[in-house]
Amino acid sequence: MSSSHPAPGPAPHRTGVRTRTAAPVGARPRGRTRVGVRHAAAAVALAALLGGVTGCGDGSRSGRDGGRAGHGSGEQAAQAQGERGEHSRRGFSLFATGDLLVHDSIIRQARADAGGSGYDFGRMIAAAKPLARQADLAICHMETIYGPDGGPFTGYPLFQTPPQLARSVKEAGYDSCSTGSNHTLDDSADGVGRTLKAMDGAGLKHVGSARSKQERGRPALLRAGDAKVAQLSYTYGTNGISLPENKPWLVNLIEPERIIRDARVARRAGADVVVASLHWGTEWQESPDELQRSVAKKLTASRSHGRRDIDLILGTHAHVPQAYEKVNGTWVVYGMGDQIAGKMNDPRGSMGTAARFHFVPPKTRPGAKDSKGGSRQWTVDKAGFTPFMMKTSPRHTLINLASEKSRGAGDPAQDEAYETIRKAVFSRGAEEDGLRMLP
């Protein structure tokens, strides 16, 4: 199996071909045997779980930014909502970022930032913290699995990340992370178990991988504004590492029919908004590939009783910023690029975007239908993105390129990254559909 490198080099990897994530400069890949994979069975009903959701995560946003303060009990919230009518329900803001790709150099930097004792990833992603904490809902993509508490910790090609990453991400303001990726099975069930245990301990919701059939049937369920948000997560493959026959639920694979079924189960159980996180695409290609486009069209075209099944698609995996596009009236982020990563042969591997969307509730009262036949449909009224760059020298540091540019800072490398990201994001007409770059 070939490794994944920027051009020039081996041919780029495409969705549907089992591949390894991009290697940092100087990395030497190790091989694995390709084995066929079959996916798990149907999703488990979520009504009881969704009915009990009254807050997001551990509620740490309360008092911090006003986004979720004062929800009260579920009964009180329901009564208040019934009194004021659906037309007065609060909307919510969503913030999402790309791959947390923890190469060896990232591990060393986290060790140094912790003073040589433990690992601290917080300084590296500090530039995302104000935006993540300001949003009502912040979502990350946890591409790599975690190693044992005491290590050893490794980067490419079989990742085992220090579990302290979960705490750093939570402290930065994130609520939930997708975990379905081509590296989910780098250490089989043990790696999945360690990763989800650490995320549970940090108070981070997670979806995309699971420790049991029952857990696989549950999306990440989050409260944002007055909405119940269901997050789903799937990957194109697992680098040829087979799912154990007795544990087919370890990771979710991209199968459009299954994604639609899962979304409908979440809808019937009360989810107002369904977000699908998809690990897909051709590495180092800014344009979405054929499978990305076809899956996006199928998912966004799917309707139940006149209501769309998927409200937003957030893509990862390509390691470069990809286009944003409205497909069948639904926003699709084909690829957000990397949020953190070691130095790549291709400088675009250090570039990424943060997706920023604001959802508003339907204007009709519960059960009423609008003129187009939809019912209870939340919609995006503001769409934006923020360009970021991971500076790799003299230390790994995430930089908000739009903020730097607005205050006249930056350098030629940052200016080039800013323009590269802008062109990629707007390459499929998103600007005409209202997408804006935000600091």
Please describe what each predicted stretch is.
Residues 44-50, 275:
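Hydrophobic alpha-helical targeting segments used for export or membrane insertion
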Residues 13-45:
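N-terminal export and membrane-targeting signals
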Residues 52-55:
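C-terminal motif of bacterial Sec signal peptides marking the signal peptidase cleavage site
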Residues 2-9, 13, 57-439:
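Acidic, metal/ion-coordinating pockets
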